[in-house]
């Protein structure tokens, strides 16, 4: 059920087909044996319920996903968060087993897709790993353990004393730190404020921004949390936090998915 405070972008699509959004899949093995692709339901619900679009999962596997054909089919793309990290060879760093798992098939799709979306003006929204992929696609680098940099907080998800993930999603996705937005920037304008508070569930983070990557928001400890791609003809924003968490009620995440939905309608109208 859509929260009553959410302005339903789907109302704007009455009498026309809803925009279609490609949501990237992540590699997963059922019982550690059977290869599959999966997407977290929160991502799908955010696209459907707040952006007002039809979510369509596509494989994060270059042997399956033809990027040109995909972009001829969808009106926008969401690069979701994922457990696997971007492989360090994409930004000239040696891999290490403590930073595994990696998903190089998704890397191959997401990096090429980021450039293709921007080149074609197709709305692109990167979340957590998706922000990192956008940065690497445009020549940037990542640090595999942000918490090891001087003065940085631990941005990883909360865990129990035994190391297991906390079972309560309200604890896992609780707002944990502020993000200061660039005055007059895209995010400050979109959200109508200078400071927001967000969740934090990541180990890697941006070290060096890519050539066209514009920093739009920074955490209290200096970690880059929001970006846009300079001179992109369409929506091309990325966030380090998990904006897919409860955008039906969270005003910051809701505003982002609504803006993405509006960009989809505008892009669809130009098609």
Residue ranges and their predicted role:
Residues 1-125, 135-143, 147-191, 203, ...:
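N-terminal beta1-alpha1 cap of cysteine-dependent amidohydrolase-like domains
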Residues 237-240:
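Active-site-proximal beta-strand elements of phosphoester/diester hydrolases
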Residues 128:
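Conserved G/P- and acidic residue-centered "switch" motifs that form tight phosphate/ATP-binding loops
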